[in-house]
Amino acid sequence: MSASQGSKNTNAEPWGGFDDNIIQGTGSAVIDMENMDDTSGSSFEDVGEMHQRMREEEEVTAEAAATEEDNGEYGEFLGMKGLKGQLGRQVADEVWQAGKRQASKAFNLYANIDILRPYFDVEPIQVRNRLVESLIPVRMINFPQKVAGELYGPMMLVFTLVAILLHGMKTSGTVIREGTLMGTAIGTGFGYWLGVSSFIYFLAYLCNAQITMLQMLSLLGYGLFGHCVVLFITYNVHFHSLFYLLWMVIGGLSTLRMVAVLISRTVGQTPRLILCGSLAALHMLFLLYLHFAYHKMVEGILDTLEGPNIPPIQRVARDVPVVASAVVNATVKSIAAIVQSQQL
């Protein structure tokens, strides 16, 4: 039994070692099979693509390095010429990009012109009615009065005011180049419209008035209708009394219209007084300025053309006695000389 067991043990030891090798081998084989099972055919394709991509990146890197070496050698060979060439290409690229951006901005601006269309989409009969209403003060101030949110009528009135100012400059004899006359008239008209509208809107914001900037531009623009009427008449008919009458009636009506609208949209006595008083003072004083800015020159031209206020008869009457006495003295002297010659 012992011999048989010994033989069995001697036989078992090499087989045990062989079994260990088999187990180790099978262990490694199992691990490899699991990895092979986990990786599908697409994984092998991805690995191939990865190797291809790495190869392409290496080629691109090699080409870039070669290009840099060539550029370095070319730049060293050309010196300042190569540097100037590179700067020229960079400047040309920047100019091209800047022009491209400007062209795209111009195209976008032209495409966005339709944004302003609602502010100028108005019928002529509506403009006529609003011009008439600008001289009729509203009576109901308990609720906010409606203000048209359009800019066609106000802008046309500003251009009309510019034309009237040019007419006044020409009749007053202002000797300035035409471009300066036009620029002064446009600056005066649009400066008052935009500047006073912004200032009154700022005061309205401080006084908590319910009015927008667009409504303020429309309200003040239509308020210039009275100014246009008064200036057109008084620039052609030079009478102080007529101007003051039109200033009080027409200018006052247009101012009262705007004041009534602002009162209906403002709460509180003090805010109403500040807001409406500022607007009324600026609007009425602006009309006085536009009239008297060239009034002195007009009077000087009229005095030059018509002469001084002294009647010509009085001037002749003062000169007549002097002339008569001189003639009489000359006649007496001539007669005395003739008499003396006859006596001799």
Swiss-Prot record:
Biased composition (Polar residues): 1-12
Segments crossing the lipid bilayer: 147-167, 186-206, 213-233, 243-263, 273-293
Gene Ontology terms describing biological process: cell differentiation
Keyword RNA-binding part of the UniProt annotation: no
Region (Disordered): 1-24
Places the protein is found: Cell membrane; Golgi apparatus, cis-Golgi network membrane; Cytoplasm
Topological category with respect to the lipid bilayer: Multi-pass membrane protein
Cytoplasmic side: 1-146, 207-212, 264-272
Subcellular location, principal: membrane
Domain of life: Eukaryota
Keywords recorded for this protein, A-Z: Cell membrane, Cytoplasm, Differentiation, Glycoprotein, Golgi apparatus, Membrane, Transmembrane, Transmembrane helix
Glycosylation: residue positions: N329
GO cellular component term, pick one: plasma membrane
InterPro entries in the cross-refs: tRNA_Mod/Golgi_Maint (IPR051521)
Coiled-coil ranges (or none): none
Primary role: Involved in the maintenance of the Golgi structure. May play a role in hematopoiesis.
Family, similarity comment: Belongs to the YIP1 family.
Protein name: Protein YIPF3
Upper taxonomic lineage: Eukaryota, Metazoa, Chordata, Craniata, Vertebrata
Gene this protein is translated from: yipf3
